[in-house]
Swiss-Prot record:
Protein's cellular compartments: Cytoplasm
Family (UniProt): Belongs to the UreD family.
Gene: ureD
Protein name: Urease accessory protein UreD
MF-aspect GO terms: nickel cation binding
Function: Required for maturation of urease via the functional incorporation of the urease nickel metallocenter.
Highest taxon of the lineage: Bacteria
Subunit structure: UreD, UreF and UreG form a complex that acts as a GTP-hydrolysis-dependent molecular chaperone, activating the urease apoprotein by helping to assemble the nickel containing metallocenter of UreC. The UreE protein probably delivers the nickel.
Gene Ontology cellular component list: cytoplasm
Major subcellular site: cytoplasm
Source organism of the structure: Arthrobacter sp. (strain FB24)
Amino acid sequence: MSTTAAPEVELVETETPMGELALRVAVRGCRSVAAHQYHRGALRILRPHYLDDSGQVCYVVVNPGGAYLGADLYVIDVEVGDGAKLLLTTQSATKIYRTPGSFAEQRVCLRLGEGAQLELAPDQLIAYREASYRQNTRITVRPSSSLVMAEVVTPGWSPDGASFRYEELRLRNEIQVETPGGTGLLALDNLLIRPPLNDVTGMGFMEGYSHLGSLVVVDARVEQALADEFHALTAGHDACTGVSLTASVGGTTGLVLRSLSNSTEELNRLLGACTALLRERWYGQSPLNLRKY
């Protein structure tokens, strides 16, 4: 296993990341293993483990510092090789504290090979009072790749009890499909919340809710029938949910689910129900149970 090369995410000459992490997963025998890994600064990964006999490897990302602060830059680069299977999660919530002077930022690059499976299941992102955070995720898939990415965003505690005391949250996902004929844009998902500039609590935005859940699925098996199933599946939860599909590019399609609630636990249950359906139907795996707490 190589441990020398840094991440491939682009940096300008003056930028020094607070933490860097690179991971490449490949198939060895009947299991997926790390063919290369690298870390520097305030990012680590724990030893791999396997939750079932599917061969999917699970890695846990750790930030020993415990939080993101002003002007912090974190860089994560992950490649899942042809036929490999990776579950990537975090040890705990990502906490964004006050960021005076400049925003905290995380840049993520994900690349999936043919037949590769990537499941992203991080703990919630918590933005505290006077926090500004930007997350830019660039994803490249192949037509036979399978991507499932879940995320929950919550406001942190504030002395006055108000929910939206952070300055800015900007979460951008760009998904490209690479085919023999070239690369095409499948989806550009840009979430921007600026509480000081807009009333984000009302109609057309957070609709009176405080927590946001997102699920992004990219797979050749995505179709309208799946979106309809998700609509029915989420109806029994205490949340306001919408599901949409992208156009097909290179034979694969994307699904985006957005859900609003006042509870992290409720959103985790909702997203967990959706991912459990996919895990059983597509991969023959049981519902995800990471048993962190």
